[in-house]
């Protein structure tokens, strides 16, 4: 049944989201900045299918970064993905044709990257205004490394996810996911 299929897809994407920060060899960590290749791909795939699925996968991803031993500020950044994931899933629900690719997906992906970066920058600012400040150039590290890096990283992962999404037959955000 479709309920079991949806549950299985959600569980698989959550498992990927948990495992990527733990086992991915291609990662750069300079707190509060971190770049783990493909870490957003399960979130994007879930976002393409359902808001509920996206929310579950963000929780899994956040857990993965926590279990992998990343600094708390990076775990908070992972939790901030809930914002762009839910907003993106909501938009896709209303405009599923964006997943056909082309300029509409490019615009969607850039906007998601900007929203994603704003969420991560806010998570860093919240963290550093409520804890002791490290000896860093806050403007450069938070706005350039985290903000700018997140936009680029998000866009790359968005395209990877779209490529995977298109390669899997039978995935359609309007047909197989009930209760979006």
Q: Language-model features: where?
A:
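Loop-helix junctions at membrane interfaces
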Residues: 1-180
């Amino acid at each position: 049944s479709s309920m079991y299929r949806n549950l299985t897809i959600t569980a698989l994407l959550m498992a990927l989201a948990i495992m990527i920060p733990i086992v991915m060899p291609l990662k750069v960590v300079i707190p509060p900045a971190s770049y783990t290749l493909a870490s957003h791909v399960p979130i994007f795939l879930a976002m393409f299918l359902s808001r509920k699925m996206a929310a579950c996968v963000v929780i899994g991803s956040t857990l993965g970064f926590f279990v992998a031993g990343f600094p708390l500020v990076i775990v908070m950044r992972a939790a901030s993905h809930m914002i762009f994931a839910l907003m993106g899933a909501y938009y896709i629900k209303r405009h599923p044709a964006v997943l056909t690719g082309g300029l509409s997906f490019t615009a969607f992906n850039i906007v998601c990257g900007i929203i994603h970066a704003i969420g991560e920058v806010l998570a860093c600012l919240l963290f550093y205004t409520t804890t002791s400040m490290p000896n860093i150039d806050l403007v450069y590290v938070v706005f350039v490394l985290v903000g700018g890096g997140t936009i680029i990283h998000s866009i790359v992962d968005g395209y990877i996810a779209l490529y995977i999404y298109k390669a899997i037959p039978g995935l359609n955000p309007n047909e197989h996911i009930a209760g979006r």
